[in-house]
Amino acid sequence: MGVEISLDPPVCPIQANGGVSKHKMINHCDKILAFKVKSSNNSNYSVNLIYGILKVCDVKELVITRKPGKPQADKLIIQYCMVEDENADPKPLFANGVPPGELSGETVIKLSAAE
């Protein structure tokens, strides 16, 4: 398994006093992927996409928003798994916390708010 999903840019430079960072979420494989975006700090960070489907070589915009707060070592985790149907509902696939299937995994993005 390689890098199935990545973000461009791969880092999130948001100030501790708040802000917005826009990224491209890219599917690098030849499979349809369902995804779930999780944050280690839901008090300060939110995203425009929580669940979704990335078609083969698809790109979606992920907008990360930070509320003002103390800077700390936070991260976003993009869990993913292969699906056969691009119209599948991705939410139930992540109900157990671990994405199912042979082609599954996660991409971790470090969130480093600067003062």
UniProtKB/Swiss-Prot annotation:
Residues annotated as signal peptide: none
Q: Which Gene3D superfamilies match?
A: Immunoglobulins
Q: Which residues form a coiled coil?
A: none
Q: Where is the MSP domain?
A: 1-115
Stored PANTHER family: MAJOR SPERM PROTEIN, MSP DOMAIN-CONTAINING PROTEIN
Protein name as it appears in the record: Uncharacterized protein ZK1307.3
- The source organism is Caenorhabditis elegans
Top-level taxonomy? Eukaryota, Metazoa, Ecdysozoa, Nematoda, Chromadorea
